[in-house]
From Swiss-Prot:
GO terms for molecular function: protein phosphatase 1 binding; protein serine/threonine phosphatase inhibitor activity. This is Type 1 phosphatases regulator ypi1. Residues 78-88 have a biased composition (Acidic residues). It comes from Schizosaccharomyces pombe (strain 972 / ATCC 24843) (Fission yeast). InterPro entries: PPI_Ypi1. GO terms for biological process: mitotic spindle assembly checkpoint signaling. One of its GO terms (cellular component) is cytosol. PANTHER family: E3 UBIQUITIN-PROTEIN LIGASE PPP1R11, E3 UBIQUITIN-PROTEIN LIGASE PPP1R11-RELATED. The gene is ypi1.
Amino acid sequence: MELTRPLGDISSSATVTIESTEESASISHEESENVLHLQPEPVRRVRWTVSTVDNEHMNKKKSKVCCIFHKQRKFDESSSDSDSDSDSDSSCSSCCSRNAYERA
């Protein structure tokens, strides 16, 4: 930081330059420097309850309800209006008429 000012009245041409030391500036800078300490979020883990059913060892052949996707229709749209989906609906076996517990 430099300060420059003329000495005496306007007719004189001498100037004095005052330089401040950087040590005092750096000390005040270190004091005003804030440090933020961040804590990591706790690790989220899946926890199973006692009432959780194990589907892997229940001798089920498959866990999917049905392998064919049925497109949702609007309320006023009939099922006979579908274009090419009607062919795929006929290939669905009787597995879709029963729920997953009845098929097991």
